[in-house]
Design a protein with these regions (language model features):
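Flexible, solvent-exposed loop/hinge segments that line or gate ligand/substrate-binding clefts
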Residues: 221-256
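Solvent-exposed loop/turn segments at secondary-structure junctions
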Residues: 4-6, 24-26, 73-77, 100-104, ...
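Short acidic catalytic loops
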Residues: 15-22, 122-140, 200
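Terminal peptide-recognition signature
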Residues: 7, 15-18, 44, 96, ...
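Loop/turn elements at helix/coil->beta-strand transitions in domains of secreted/extracellular proteins
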Residues: 14, 91-94, 126-131, 159-163, ...
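Gly/Ser/Thr-rich loop/hinge elements
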Residues: 140-198, 236-238
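C-terminal, low-ordered peptide segments at domain boundaries
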Residues: 22-128
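Conserved PDZ fold ligand-binding element
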Residues: 8-28
Length: 256
């Protein structure tokens, strides 16, 4: 659940089923009411399996209680969704769920990058020596953010070495760019000097998220856990139509 969201305030958790709303079961009849986003009373259930006397397993959703969910409202879903240090088998594992490569909102262009730096500073202070990077829901974003993330993950002796090549078309060779592991980007963050990173993926993992995986691979052990990623090894740039208010994300270069 997004921190501070109506769903979090209502106590909803992963695995909960919404069985009833305002006394009615969830059917086509209440669909319009569901979409209105007003305050509603919810009956919550969980799925349980029961083994019968004959050994047959049956399952179903059983109610566990009711809760009131406040009305929907605008909410900033920050890229650093969750981070923590997990003690495991004598080691300290850093876990980061990073959902978008975005530096910050328009009101503070580095706010989200500073959240990322703060997380890595805490990882370093906590003595993290293993790392899990959760990119399951990350569909890409800014290359600058990827450069920052990679710089804080990579082995310390790889600083200033080549991270990625951005190659444009023959008509835009002047835009070609080489990205490095740039320690100047770290600022208030920290380099963890890791030798291995475990990356959680789904088929929604794409674009810049895949660049991080591919560009770290020559310098450290990258272990993928999950399903195959989308396979979009290119950089895109959003173009906003001035009057019709739609956005096109056009491919602008290849990333190697």
């Amino acid at each position: 659940m997004v921190p501070g969201s109506p769903a979090e305030e209502a106590g909803l958790q992963r695995g909960h089923w919404i069985m009833m709303m305002n006394g009615d079961y969830i059917t086509k009849k209440v669909e319009s009411e569901l979409l209105q986003g007003s305050t509603r009373q919810l009956q919550i259930g969980v799925y349980k399996e029961v083994v019968g006397e004959d050994g047959e397993v049956t399952g179903g959703v059983v109610p566990i209680g009711e809760t009131t969910m406040p009305a929907s409202r605008s909410l900033a879903d920050k890229p650093v969704h969750r981070f923590e240090i997990i003690p495991w088998n004598g080691k300290k594992v850093g876990y980061l769920m990073y959902n978008e490569f975005k530096a910050g909102p328009t009101t503070d262009s580095q706010a989200y990058n500073d959240d990322l730096r703060r997380a890595f500073r805490d990882f370093q202070t906590g003595g993290v020596n293993e790392f899990v990077l959760d990119l399951r829901y990350n569909t890409g974003g800014s290359l600058d953010c990827a450069q920052l993330l990679c710089t804080m993950l990579a082995p310390a002796d790889k600083m200033n070495q080549l991270l990625a090549l951005l190659r444009y078309s023959d008509k835009r060779v002047e835009a070609n760019q080489d990205l490095t592991f740039n320690p100047e980007l770290i600022q208030s963050g920290a380099n963890l000097d890791l030798s291995t990173v475990y990356v959680l993926t789904t088929n929604a993992t794409r674009g810049v998220a895949e660049m991080v995986i591919n560009c770290l691979n020559p310098y450290m052990k990258v272990v993928l856990i999950g399903t195959k990623t989308a396979g979009e090894y290119v950089a895109t740039k959003p173009f906003v139509h001035p009057t019709d208010r739609f956005i096109l994300n056009l491919v602008v270069c290849n990333v190697y």
